[in-house]
Amino acid sequence: APLEPVYPGDNATPEQMAQYAAEMRRYINMLTRPRY
């Protein structure tokens, strides 16, 4: 199973936050993908 992305912290740069958001979206997509 994919690992949950680590939150970069409250003083993360916007780039880090964007990266985290993208990884989180991909992670959630993997979790919710139906398994046929």
Swiss-Prot record:
Coiled coil: none
GO terms under biological process: feeding behavior; neuropeptide signaling pathway
Any single GO CC term annotated in Swiss-Prot or TrEMBL for this entry: extracellular space
Cross-referenced InterPro entries: Pancreatic_hormone-like, Pancreatic_hormone-like_CS
UniProt cross-references to CDD domains, sorted A to Z: PAH
Compartments, as annotated in UniProt: Secreted
Principal location listed in the UniProt entry: secreted
Keywords from the named record: Amidation, Hormone, Secreted
Modification sites for Tyrosine amide: Y36
Recorded GO MF terms: neuropeptide hormone activity; neuropeptide Y receptor binding
Signal peptide: none
Protein role: Hormone secreted by pancreatic cells that acts as a regulator of pancreatic and gastrointestinal functions probably by signaling through the G protein-coupled receptor NPY4R2.
Similarity remark: Belongs to the NPY family.
The name this protein goes by in its record: Pancreatic polypeptide
Native organism: Chinchilla chinchilla (Short-tailed chinchilla)
Gene expressing this chain: PPY
